[in-house]
Amino acid sequence: MASIIRVTKEFSFEMAHALWNYDGPCRNVHGHSYRLFVTLYGNPLEEPDNPKNGMVIDFSDLKKIVKREIVDVFDHSVVVSRYFDKEKTDMFSALFGNTVLVDYQPTCENLVSDFAGRIARLLPVGIKLHSLKLYETTTSYAEWYAADNQESASSDLEFGVLKVKKNQI
């Protein structure tokens, strides 16, 4: 039955952030209840003696990856860009404790792109990341699709979460 199947798992976490150099109220530290939908695709396993028979991925295995790479890192944290001056980032750490510094402006759009890289690199062979949907509020979200990013993956080199164009090196 070699059908390609998509499977999706939902995760939630609480996170605060501040947008460096932003001209609106989101420049202030504020928080959201995020919801992340992770969609993978692949062929269900066809090995009758394997306990994972019939699965694209065991949802508990996907949960372990996302929990370790996303939820445990970002839940109940304050996320700020390294672009803030060191005095401010030190202050965030002193005031809030769990502060995560990232190499980008921590918008919903940039977060979902970062999360895609963190998840995709850990998926088992034969299973691919199809898409992510990150809700920042009940009515606002950003989406990442593998199909939309195939061309850019060959023209960009990734260094952590900071992307540099080949012609900029």
Model-derived features with residue positions:
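Charge-rich, low-complexity N-terminal segments
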Residues: 1-169
